[in-house]
């Protein structure tokens, strides 16, 4: 009888631990709701004043769970790169999504487009877990997380401090930390010498889509990158752009072309993720902004620039 009571108590403790893990202050932990948005947990555990993680490992993690050393050194053999590429996955991962009360809108990009920002990297705690497009994250492969780039976009990452570079394929969403533009795998972070520092100022250049590097970058790729990268990436016919936009805005209509072009130039300079053009129709020069993923995204743009803009479907 005593053994049965102990067993019941033990199961009760396990249940309570599980409940506490899943919920905190009555709110379901995001990692259980959507495991792939793992960078959100990083954001909550990051202290911007000390620039250090506030998260402390529990007893089990400290003494039993395998971790790499502070330099991220780990000689374990890599998993299969495992790219998932289908129209269904592409459509699903271009939908707007919300993290921490903020909406993110995957949007169109063009071949050769450039972006500047701060890169970080993620590794052991997420190795072998699912990414946003359903792949298994492999910290030894050249992949990365980005908040809005289409899945399987191939990007060159340049560390502007030392001019080293690498190539990655986007297969995850994040990092959901202020001022971060991309979250690199351990392998990619090593290529540009940022593992120890943790972050680096980078420039991103879009090289291709669908996991394929465009032929126009073939010579540079063959001359400058290692055999490892040549095993992971191939050069071929790649689309010139990928667009998920379904909505557009007419921001103004002018009889004078100069006035229309002035507004278009201003909007384009301030909004690199959208396509802004001037179209002549019905004897008017109309300023159009294209590339919105949802009506909500377009209306947010209207609130910022012009409440009277005309919303249309592309």
Swiss-Prot record:
Protein name: Endolytic peptidoglycan transglycosylase RlpA
Lipidation (S-diacylglycerol cysteine): 20
Keyword Cell wall biogenesis/degradation part of the UniProt annotation: yes
InterPro entries with a match to the protein in the record: RlpA, RlpA-like_DPBB, RlpA-like_sf, RplA, SPOR-like_dom, SPOR-like_sf
Enzyme Commission number(s) from the entry: 4.2.2.-
Keywords: Cell membrane, Cell wall biogenesis/degradation, Lipoprotein, Lyase, Membrane, Palmitate, Signal
Similarity remark: Belongs to the RlpA family.
Pfam families xref list: DPBB_1, SPOR
Lipid-anchored residues (N-palmitoyl cysteine): 20
GO MF annotation terms: lytic endotransglycosylase activity; peptidoglycan binding
Residues annotated as signal peptide: 1-19
Membrane topology listed for this record: Lipid-anchor
Superkingdom of source: Bacteria
GO biological process, one term: cell wall organization
Subcellular location: Cell membrane
Gene3D superfamilies from the UniProt entry: RlpA-like domain, Sporulation related repeat
The protein's role, per its UniProt record: Lytic transglycosylase with a strong preference for naked glycan strands that lack stem peptides.
């Amino acid at each position: 009888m005593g053994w049965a009571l102990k067993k019941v108590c033990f199961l009760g403790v396990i249940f309570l631990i599980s409940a506490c893990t899943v919920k905190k202050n009555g709110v379901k932990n995001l990692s259980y709701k959507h495991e792939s948005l793992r960078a959100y947990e990083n954001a909550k555990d990051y202290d911007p004043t000390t620039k250090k993680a506030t998260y402390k490992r529990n007893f089990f993690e400290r003494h039993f769970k395998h971790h790499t050393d502070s330099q991220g050194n780990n000689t374990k053999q890599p998993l299969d790169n495992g790219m998932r590429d289908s129209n269904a996955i592409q459509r699903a991962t271009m939908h707007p999504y919300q993290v921490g009360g903020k909406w993110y809108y995957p949007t169109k990009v063009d071949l050769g487009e450039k972006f500047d920002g701060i890169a970080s990297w993620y590794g052991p705690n997420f190795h072998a877990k699912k990414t946003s497009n359903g792949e298994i994250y492999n910290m030894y492969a050249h992949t990365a997380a980005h908040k809005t780039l289409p899945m399987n976009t191939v990007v060159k990452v340049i560390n502007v401090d030392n001019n080293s570079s690498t190539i990655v394929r986007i297969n995850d969403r994040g990092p959901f930390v202020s001022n971060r533009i991309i979250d690199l795998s351990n392998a990619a972070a090593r290529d540009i010498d940022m593992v120890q520092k943790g972050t680096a100022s980078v420039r991103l250049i879009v090289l291709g889509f669908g996991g394929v590097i465009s032929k126009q970058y073939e010579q540079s790729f063959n001359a400058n990158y290692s055999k490892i990268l040549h095993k992971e990436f191939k050069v071929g016919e790649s689309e010139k752009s990928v667009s998920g936009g379904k909505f557009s805005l007419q921001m103004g209509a002018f009889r004078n072309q100069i006035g229309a072009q002035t507004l278009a130039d201003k909007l384009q300079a301030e909004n690199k993720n959208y396509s802004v053009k001037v179209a002549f129709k019905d004897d008017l020069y109309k300023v159009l902004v294209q590339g919105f993923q949802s009506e909500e995204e377009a209306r947010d743009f209207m609130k910022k620039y012009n409440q009277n803009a005309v919303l249309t479907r592309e």
